[in-house]
């Protein structure tokens, strides 16, 4: 998904200038990194606010157009108002096509409804991670990574080493030997309690006990016959 952002160079800086800028419906921001100096910018608040709702905006290479000059950037930081739907400041980082980047990518969980642990055991899929830090060249950056839980049984766990990664994408945590859990299927307490209560069948009772009960019942039948 190609996303383009339009911005203008920001001449005035400082708290007062930023406050006036926000009052006029603009958002102060900055582009940094690479061989060029940092460039203060200003963006239209409404357009930016709607773009921020796109998942791909947070995990994709973006095309930044500053007064007609375009360059590739990544979203690096957003400052939001504590209780109003307002963007206070935004940071972008330039990217070079030949240098690896580190980026958090969202995880999309698929086939949850057909997982044996859900369909047969009544379990619930627990998302231990919802995003993943990856390393790759800009051209290889995925918008998301799919996690297939279609064969996951109750009590089992999917780890980082089980993920199917796009070509050219690496997981720094795995390279450090950290095979973190990604998703698991847990049995709710109510379901587990019902299974435990209903699990004591005749086959679960020791044979010696079953025999004693059988003898006792047979004796009761004979006594009843004599009384008649």
UniProtKB/Swiss-Prot annotation:
Region: Disordered, residue numbers: 1-21, 198-228
One protein family per Pfam: Ribosomal_TL5_C
One GO location term (cellular component): cytosolic large ribosomal subunit
InterPro entries, alphabetized: Rbsml_bL25/Gln-tRNA_synth_N (IPR020056), Ribosomal_bL25/Gln-tRNA_synth (IPR011035), Ribosomal_bL25_b-dom (IPR020057), Ribosomal_bL25_C (IPR037121), Ribosomal_bL25_long (IPR001021), Ribosomal_bL25_short (IPR020055), Ribosomal_L25_dom (IPR029751), Ribosomal_uL5_bac-type (IPR020930)
GO biological process: translation
Record field: compositional bias (Basic and acidic residues): 1-13, 210-228
Classification via SUPFAM superfamilies: Ribosomal protein L25-like
HAMAP family in alphabetical order: Ribosomal_bL25, Ribosomal_bL25_CTC
Function, as annotated: This is one of the proteins that binds to the 5S RNA in the ribosome where it forms part of the central protuberance.
Alphabetical list of NCBIfam families matching this protein: bL25_bact_ctc, PRK05618.1-2, PRK05618.1-5, PRK05943.1
Family affiliation: Belongs to the bacterial ribosomal protein bL25 family. CTC subfamily.
Protein name: Large ribosomal subunit protein bL25
């Amino acid at each position: 998904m190609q996303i383009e952002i339009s911005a203008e160079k920001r001449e005035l800086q400082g708290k007062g200038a930023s406050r006036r800028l926000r009052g006029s419906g603009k958002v102060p921001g900055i582009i940094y990194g690479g061989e060029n100096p940092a460039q203060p910018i200003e963006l239209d608040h409404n357009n930016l606010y709607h773009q921020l709702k796109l998942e791909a905006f947070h995990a994709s290479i973006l095309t930044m157009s500053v007064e007609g000059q375009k360059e590739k950037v990544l979203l690096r930081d957003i400052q939001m108002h504590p209780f109003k739907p307002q963007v206070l400041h935004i940071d972008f980082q330039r990217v070079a096509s030949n240098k690896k980047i580190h980026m958090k990518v969202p995880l999309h969980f698929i086939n949850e409804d057909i997982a044996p642990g859900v369909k047969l055991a009544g379990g619930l899929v627990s998302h231990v991670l919802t995003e993943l830090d990856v390393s790759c060249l800009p051209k290889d950056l995925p918008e998301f990574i799919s996690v297939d839980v279609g064969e996951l049984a109750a009590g089992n766990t999917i780890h980082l080493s089980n993920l199917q990664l796009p070509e050219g994408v690496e997981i720094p945590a795995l390279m450090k030997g950290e095979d973190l859990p990604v998703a698991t299927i847990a049995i709710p307490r109510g379901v587990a309690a019902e299974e435990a209560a209903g699990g004591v069948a005749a086959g679960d009772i020791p044979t010696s006990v079953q025999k004693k009960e059988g003898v006792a019942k047979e004796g009761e039948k004979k006594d009843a016959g004599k009384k008649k």
